[in-house]
Amino acid sequence: MARVSRRQFLRVTAGGAAGALALGRAPAVAQTRELTFLSIASFVPETDKELKRQFEEWGAKNKVKVRLDIIAHLQLQTKKAAEVQARSGHDLTALGPGLGDADLYFDYLADLNDVATDVAPKNGGWLSQSDYLIRGKWKLLPWWQPPFPMAVRTDLLEKLGEKSPDTWEDWLRVGKKGKAMGHPFGTAMGHSGDANVTLLSILWSYGGSYVGKDGKTITINSKETRQAMDFVKRLYTEAMDPEVLAWDDASNNRCLNAGKCIAIHNPISAYESAKKDKVVVPGTQKEIAEVIDHIHTPRGPADRKATTGFWCVGIWNFSKNVDLAKDFLRYHFQPENLNKWVEAGHGFNMPFLTNLTRHPVYKSDKQYRFIPEVAKVTVPPSWPGPNTAASQQVWDLYIIPDMFAQHATGKMTADQAIAWAEKEMQEIYAGRKRKP
Amino acid sequence: MQLKTVEGDVAKLAARGEAPTAGLSDFLVRDTPVAYAFIGPAFFLLLFLVAYPFVLSLWFSLSDARVGETGSFVGLDNFARLLRSGIFLQTLQNSIVFTAAALTLKTVLGMILALLLFRLVRFKRLIRGAVLLPFIVPTALSTLVWWWMFEPLYSVVNWTLKSLHIVNYDIPWLPDPYLAMFTVILVNTWRGLPFFAITLLAGLVAIPRELYEAAESDGAGPIGRFWHVTVPLLKPVLAVVILFSAIFTLADFNIVYVLTKGGPFNMTHLFATYSFVLGLQSGQIGQGAAVSLFLFPILLAVVFVQLRMVRKAAMYD
Amino acid sequence: MTSPGRRIRPLFTLYLPVMPFVLFALFPLYFMLITSLKKNSELYDVTTVPFLIKRGVTLGHYQLLSQDTLFWSWFVNSLIVSVAATVVSVVIGILAAYPLARLRFPGGDSFGVAIFVTYLVPPSLLFLPLSTVVNRLGLSDSLWALVVTYPTFLVPFCTWLLLGYFRTVPKEIEECAMLDGCNRLQTLVRILLPVAVPGVICAALFAFTLSWNEFLYALVFVSPAELKTMTVGVISELIRGDIYYWGGLMAGACVGSLPIVIAYVFFLDYYVSGLTAGAVK
């Protein structure tokens, strides 16, 4: 089976010259097979450790040398682009956030139809299979998502006499009262992934959307969008501080853990880190993790919908080890391995497989009880349109957050902001038309 | 230009009558094979690792290339599309404001700092070393500390201002578009100032003392000496430093990427960050390359003109 | 003997005005240092005084760095790459600067300008085509990739700086040496270089700083954890999605700045005098 790949050959040749100085790696030994995997630093570090353990275990069983490389998620884009450009790099790669990579790198990803059909039945089937197929094919496996519940300070809610707020309007009311006593509501509205998630959730909850099912028609210009925008304007001016315009993905976590925010729309990572760092409520000895609870993502007049980062995994088709890589994916997607992996991640990394959403970890802590519920209403960010490179670009350019923020801050009227977003989106979608 | 310098030297040598004949000296500067052999390594390095990728980038900007594909020729279509995009026009404006403001700040403050450093006697090394530090700490990490200092919730800057009762509310350094631009300019200045100060200091050291003494005996005060001796003699250094810094400031990526990601409302996007979003995140290399190269023709012209001027100035010293 | 008035005056006209500059330069670095020494519970408590450490100094962040990550390997990698790239660039720079400063040959002027123009090429763009080249050379995932690519942005600067420096050295001594039978290379090494030491040190220091700080190429061309450079390693491992390990990041920045700070402490005077001659001419 062992083949000397061109890459290995070149490396050996180059290594000969380099060998004396032993800079970098020793010349690769051509006889051993090596499988490499590029992944992102997980938000819960134990997840990476468990993945590494499984990867090595599989490697030992199959006599394959394995290497798991971890990078910060912000750097993944650069790395993917460089590997595709060079047609060389890792065998397996994390993809995302979002399924857009499958469209963007369609020609460079190996088909995973066989793996996807193999692993589904053992795990109770995919949550929403049609969402993950890109141009009718499995180009990646959706891997994990961090569902976005509402993280809330129960002690403050009690003080305000509020009981289980459920709609976005409820949260506006709570936030308004909270802000009056120095505990505003917090949701990012700047250039960050969280801003995309929450503002899209609000847009859908009010019945709006930005692209039609056909993946072509821009549907942002609607009365539902206007309603959503007016709501966000009120939320911004009455219930939040202007700082949300500059928030990155980490800011709302800090706002909650510092004891300032009454509630944030965020995965459980804030709670997890508060628990680990033993952060206390300012001015008391009480641990803040004890007064945090997570409840359902809010409902709007039209719907209850949310989205999140869809993290995926794929295999480059220029890899010399496509079959080996598939074999590892099958191994990792075995129920017992996925179970251990979800356990290690405290449920933060929820797979897109039905059985895993019922993982015992979600019953282990009262905090997690709504996570599976949120997952049920979670849709891809381009909903109801398909995931495409264009929808990914709408996400990457933060068109949705900017549209909302420009209206909320009074920089533009609702109509101006919508017209602006509509034009940008039309340009993006038009520029993305595939040549016949 | 080279020629003139050489002739000048030959004339000098001949006049002093201590050098070999002009013919031999002329022979000594004509050694083409050696010249090429010496330049060879640099030439091939730049050819393969800069020129080739650069030509490819030029091609990208004129094609509909995506990541991994060479694409086909589309002329100036990418540039035309950029000019239709509101975000790009905003980026263009931001880049000009950012570069102009940061350069002005760095030049003025750098000059003041260089003049001060020049006169130091005690703690000279210590203070020179201290002001040089921002330039040498890894940018990828030092930008993070700035972000931590301006981060809305924990901002030490706001904490200080509030504690001193200068303001009684949190200043929205990063949420407000104009303050955000101010902040990224400030951080760029922090990082670039040492380069200006130290290089200008080097220029000051090189100015002969006698010129100041002569100006003083002509009755020039400190300000007069500054304008009539220091500034004219520093001009060549200033020109090069500003040119260098203009190029690097215009290509700045890290500060904006860490502090604002181009927000709020794209009001701080620069060429590099916008090109990153278009070219890498969205995979439209053609578009991204067009953003990066948008100012290239103008810069090229500026470099040519300025280099010519600098050389002339250096020649007539 | 100077009068007290003369001794005090510089205090107001010189040392007082220079203070704001020093503060501006140092405060962020001071903040970096104390952040790296604070306990998390104090770091994330909004009610504390941000620039003091009240609840005790901790070395926990440094421990995290050296025990839970491969920090010291990254540190050594950075050192190897920076030193190697610096040596390569300075040597190539010296070789290229010499004929540009001393010889007349067809294409000399154009090459001088071309060297400067390379700076106009934005690195954020160049790295994609460059990654193809690096891969074809078989250098991906080895430190060689960086030793080979860093000179692309170091050589132009070194050449430019040394070119200026060489021009300030009188050429008579070289001419004498050549009449005595030395060849070009011998003249360059034995006669010119010893006089040009400040210029060479200045170029080397600059090259070392730029290599040490480089991020993009190091990220793109090298993946294995044990081969990462310091900045890439620290950022990869200590920024985890929406959680930043502030203490650890700042500890990395502090330790990571040390080698350059030490280099500058030793060579600061050379740096200034090297620039004096090199950049000015």
Identify the residue ranges that each predicted region occupies.
Chain B
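Transmembrane alpha-helical segments of polytopic membrane transport and secretion proteins
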Residues: 1-39, 122-124, 307-317
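A structural signal for multi-pass alpha-helical bundles of membrane permease subunits
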Residues: 34-317
